[in-house]
């Protein structure tokens, strides 16, 4: 789920990044979920047994949680109510740590990186690379001082232009006490997934993408689809927008909302929503391919560089 509707990055192959690049995102006023709203959400899902008490909140999907001025309050609330949480950040900025309490309840924190040079950051995120590194160091120092002992790692997005940078990223990760996880970058909800797989992506878009993204591993995913489908199995989950609307999955934002979670009053009602969405997709094999590609982030590519996981 998201807790705001803004991101500060300009990722080329991301739904939100493209909206930032085109100016589309500027049409919408900033919204920041506050603690009372999160309290209402958590209580609703617990009271109606939509989620179990040990459910894990992933408080990120499309937007950058550190931009929410209520982030510390939400994390404090989760600790006080025994809720599990993990978080992802692009480290373009640091959250306000001043009101943050003990962080022993945080399961993990992930730092997304599109490379390890200013050149790579200029092409994708658009941040000051040195500032990003400093923000990562500051974040880990602040969290560890507050009792964080969870999994902390860099999610290194592999592009054709940044392969030689992974060793620098590994050295940096080691110096900060982080794990390194490398993945092939992919179309992230930005609309090219299906056209690429159906062969309808425009020649210009294809030319641009093939300069930067890797595609060869897609044939491996499809060739051994059953193996990877089994490997990618997850616990049941709900995907919510920042406005507490149920959305079809992690590849969608609030513009694809189905209904408000507050209109659903049982696990069975939520399951019926997702079963209905699955039925509408039918058995078109393209959706299996999209699922495989979108979940390939679970596969570490460290072995290609002789780097242990």
What are the language-model segments listed below?
Residues 2, 17-39, 72-76, 81, ...:
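Radical SAM enzyme [4Fe-4S]-AdoMet core and its adjacent flexible, acidic
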Residues 6-9, 16-20, 35-115:
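Conserved SAM/AdoMet-binding glycine-rich loop
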């Amino acid at each position: 789920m998201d807790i705001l509707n803004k991101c500060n990055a300009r990722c080329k192959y991301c739904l939100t990044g493209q909206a930032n690049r085109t100016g589309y995102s500027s049409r919408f006023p900033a919204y920041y979920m506050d603690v009372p709203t999160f309290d209402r959400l958590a209580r609703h899902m617990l009271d109606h047994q939509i989620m179990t008490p040990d459910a894990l909140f992933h408080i990120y999907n499309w937007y950058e949680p550190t931009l929410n001025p209520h982030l510390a309050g939400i994390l404090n609330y989760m600790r006080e109510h025994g809720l599990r949480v993990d978080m992802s950040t692009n480290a373009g900025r640091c959250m306000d740590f001043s009101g943050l309490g003990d962080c022993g309840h945080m399961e993990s924190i992930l730092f997304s990186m599109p490379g390890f040079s200013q050149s790579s950051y200029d092409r994708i995120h658009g941040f000051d690379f040195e500032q990003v590194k400093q923000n990562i160091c500051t974040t880990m120092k602040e969290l560890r001082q507050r009792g964080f002992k969870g999994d902390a790692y860099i999610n290194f997005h592999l592009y054709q232009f940044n392969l030689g940078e992974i060793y620098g990223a590994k050295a940096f990760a080691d110096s900060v006490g982080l794990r390194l996880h490398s993945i092939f970058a992919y179309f992230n909800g930005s609309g090219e997934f299906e056209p690429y797989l159906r062969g309808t992506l425009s020649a210009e878009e294809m030319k641009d993408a093939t300069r930067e993204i890797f595609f060869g591993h897609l044939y491996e995913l499809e060739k051994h689809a059953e193996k990877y489908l089994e490997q990618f199995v997850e616990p049941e989950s709900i995907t919510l927008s920042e406005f507490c609307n149920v959305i079809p999955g992690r590849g969608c934002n609030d513009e694809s909302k189905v209904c408000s979670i507050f209109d659903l009053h049982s696990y069975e009602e939520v399951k019926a929503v997702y079963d209905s969405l699955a039925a509408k997709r039918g058995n078109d094999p393209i959706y299996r391919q999209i699922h495989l590609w979108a979940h390939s982030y679970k596969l570490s590519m460290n072995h290609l560089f002789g780097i242990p996981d």
